[in-house]
């Protein structure tokens, strides 16, 4: 969409150099045209089921409201292309992207604040989902349209063959991982199975992303809030150190994690589970359709993560609708955000076995069992509600995730490194990151 006017030169500067602090919502007085078509970007593979789901949602929105929407799916270099459009003073009107991107986009001045008074369905949104769209200063810059949390996938046939119970503690978890590694659960007479599938690559911070399910359950943390939106590093607390050491022992001592994990992102890790090389996998619900087809629904089960030293907290994630600065159709932006979190929008996003944009509903009036009767989805929904935790909405979560991923990866790759020394180095790096973002505790 072409802009007749663009307010806020700081938006352009921040998009180019990525160093600006947050500013007020830009583009608020751009000349408005409520009939202008909306340009929507969604971070998903072009031509894939995610794009089809977004198109389906946009079509339902058009039918319900009369606003026109053009959907563009981009996966590779999404953030770079968004910055290029900012430099051209021509951002899309709406972006559907990961909830963790809020801080970065807000700090670059790319977003406008959302007035919840104009989003009537916001009152029906799940509280923690709504909170995930708030910036450090408590203002709303994103609205959730989909949620998810991690559950434990187990090769049910392996577990039953070895006469093991579903793990209820970390000790049970470790014992099952060892049994799957050493007791030939597939019965082929070869030592070719491993207990746990784990994507521990440094790329996009995968190692940190995966490990958070264990760190938080142990009572540890990457960074902790100290009040007034400030944070301090937390990887050298006793809880964090114990969590790292316990997880590290899975790879270095009992050797129950698949070989090559430290170089693997999610695609090759997914393959180890569906190919019968690993027996447990901590992951969200988005892989159920794939594993049902490739592995077989009867071969694996979905259960909550066992309780760690503190509790069973797992990573909560999801997608958010972001209203971009400089739009000439702010009424249309608001209408789309409202529709996306409405009961109708949520059910539309959940429809079908593939190509859905909504994993777990964020509208409290939507009963997942009525839309998806498969009980595994209810398990995921209960985990999200009871144990899900989002990463904090700091100005930029990416460097925290990336830096911690590099340390976790190094500790898993080199079993000779000293755990406490590496975590002490990590805390110093995290302190610098927090200081750079202006949120370090004094």
Predicted regions and their residues:
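Conserved N-terminal structural module of periplasmic/extracytoplasmic solute-binding proteins
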Residues: 2-104, 116-123, 262, 309, ...
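Hinge/lid segment of periplasmic solute-binding proteins
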Residues: 32, 99-150, 189-192, 207-210, ...
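A local structural motif
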Residues: 63-73, 90-91, 139, 163-164, ...
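Paired acidic/hydrophobic, glycine-rich loop segments that form the ligand-binding mouth/hinge
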Residues: 93-96, 279-284
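Extracytoplasmic/periplasmic solute-binding protein
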Residues: 137, 141-145, 150, 174-232
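Conserved C-terminal helix/tail region of periplasmic/extracytoplasmic solute-binding proteins
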Residues: 160, 386-442
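Glycine-centered hinge/linker elements that transmit conformational signals in sensory
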Residues: 177, 228-261
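C-terminal lobe and pocket-closing loops
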Residues: 285-297, 308-406, 441-442
């Amino acid at each position: 969409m072409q802009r007749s006017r663009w307010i806020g030169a700081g938006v352009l500067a921040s998009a180019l150099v990525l160093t600006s602090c947050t500013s007020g919502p830009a583009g608020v007085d751009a000349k408005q045209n409520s009939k202008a078509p909306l340009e929507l970007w969604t971070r998903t593979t072009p031509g894939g089921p995610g794009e089809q789901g977004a198109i389906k949602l946009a079509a339902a929105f058009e039918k319900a409201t009369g606003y026109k929407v053009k959907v563009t799916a981009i996966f590779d270099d999404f953030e770079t292309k968004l910055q290029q459009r900012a430099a051209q003073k021509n951002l899309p009107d709406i972006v559907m992207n990961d909830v963790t991107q809020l801080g970065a986009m807000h700090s670059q001045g790319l977003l406008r604040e959302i007035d919840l008074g104009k989003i009537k369905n916001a009152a029906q949104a799940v509280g923690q989902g709504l909170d995930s769209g708030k910036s450090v200063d408590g203002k709303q810059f994103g609205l959730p349209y989909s949620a998810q949390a991690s559950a434990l996938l187990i090769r049910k046939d392996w577990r039953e063959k070895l006469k093991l119970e579903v793990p209820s503690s970390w000790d049970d978890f470790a014992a099952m991982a060892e049994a799957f590694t050493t007791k030939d659960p597939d019965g082929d007479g070869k030592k070719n199975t491993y207990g746990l599938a784990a994507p521990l690559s440094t790329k996009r911070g995968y190692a940190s992303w995966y490990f958070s399910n264990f760190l938080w359950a142990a009572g540890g943390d990457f960074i902790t809030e100290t009040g007034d939106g400030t944070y301090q590093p937390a990887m050298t607390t006793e809880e964090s150190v114990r969590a790292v050491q316990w997880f590290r022992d899975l790879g270095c001592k009992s050797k129950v994690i698949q070989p090559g994990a430290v170089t693997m992102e999610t695609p090759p890790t997914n393959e180890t589970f569906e190919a019968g090389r690993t027996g447990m996998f901590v992951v969200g619900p988005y892989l159920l359709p794939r594993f049902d087809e490739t592995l077989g629904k009867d071969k694996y089960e979905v259960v909550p993560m066992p309780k760690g030293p503190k509790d069973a907290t797992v990573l909560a994630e999801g997608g958010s609708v972001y209203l971009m600065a400089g739009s000439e159709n702010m009424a249309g932006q608001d209408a789309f955000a409202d529709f996306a979190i409405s009961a109708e929008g949520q059910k539309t996003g959940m429809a079908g076995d593939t190509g859905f944009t909504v994993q777990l509903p964020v509208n409290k009036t939507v009963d997942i069992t009525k839309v998806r009767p498969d009980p595994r989805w209810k398990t995921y929904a209960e985990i999200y509600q009871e144990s899900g935790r989002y990463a904090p909405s700091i100005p930029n979560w990416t460097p925290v995730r990336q830096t911690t991923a590099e340390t976790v990866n190094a500790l898993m790759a080199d079993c000779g490194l000293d755990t406490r020394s590496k975590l002490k180095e990590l805390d110093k790096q995290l302190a610098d990151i927090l200081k750079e973002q202006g949120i370090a505790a004094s």
